[in-house]
Regions:
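Strongly charged, low-complexity linkers/loops
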Residues: 134-136, 141, 156-166
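Short acidic/polar active-site loop segments enriched in Thr and Asp
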Residues: 2, 73, 194
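A glycine-rich beta-strand to alpha-helix segment
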Residues: 20, 160-194
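Short Gly/Ser/Thr- and charged-rich N-terminal loops/segments
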Residues: 148, 153
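Short secondary-structure boundary segments
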Residues: 11, 79, 134-137, 176
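RNA substrate-binding interface of SAM-dependent RNA methyltransferases
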Residues: 38-135, 142-145
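N-terminal positively charged helical leader segments and presequences
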Residues: 1-38
Length: 194
């Protein structure tokens, strides 16, 4: 790149900028903004994904990249009873979010939160829709039957997209590889998750 070239920039907060390079050296680049262009969100609500990180970091990084490309707003890691990973280097995940935002031409970088205790997280207020993805049968969760070791993968549960009210804020919990404990599912449901 050299002086006079036009470039496109983003602030990561919803704006694109058309700019012209005024000075380009090996160590820095100066530019002047020619035009600010707001970029509307694809989803008018706030989409928050809270998940227990997997043992394999590659999977977490892939999810962060793809979720950014799709267009979610916030990511929180949860420390659950069956979590195999108790620490996530959010600096690396943040770099992946920035890279995915640029690669997919998004104007917003998702908010990235540090690892949080599951019990404290589900007790926090959230005004929007709240969902928890789990593999238990509803009878098991309700305590009607003993939690089965052989959990059905669908359990007759509805698909998330069928349950979401378009344009409203939504918080989705995704558990660890061994699923949430049944106590965690019950606690989440007691706090309004479905």
């Amino acid at each position: 790149l050299q002086a006079g070239d036009e470039i496109r920039l983003t602030d990561g907060k919803g704006m694109f900028y058309k700019a012209e390079i005024t000075t380009a050296t090996g160590k820095r680049c100066l530019f002047k903004v020619l035009e600010a262009v707001p970029h509307p969100k694809e989803w008018s609500g706030h989409l928050h994904l809270a998940l227990a990180p997997t043992k394999n970091m590659d999977r977490i990084e892939w999810l962060a990249e793809k979720a950014t490309e799709i267009g979610f707003d916030e990511l929180t890691f949860l420390d659950c009873r069956y979590s195999e990973r108790k620490v996530v280097k959010t600096e690396r995940i943040d770099k992946i979010l920035v890279s995915a935002m640029k690669q997919s031409h998004k104007a917003r970088k998702p908010l990235l939160n540090e690892m949080e205790d599951f019990k404290r997280f589900v007790a926090r207020p959230f005004a929007g829709q709240k969902f928890i993805a789990h593999c238990y049968d509803e009878a098991d969760v309700a305590g009607v039957a003993k939690a089965s070791e052989d959990k059905a993968m669908d359990g007759g549960k509805p698909f998330l997209l069928d349950e979401l009210d378009a344009g409203q804020d939504a918080l989705v919990l995704v558990g660890p590889e061994g699923d949430f404990s049944i106590e965690e599912v019950r606690l989440a449901q007691a706090h309004g998750f479905r």
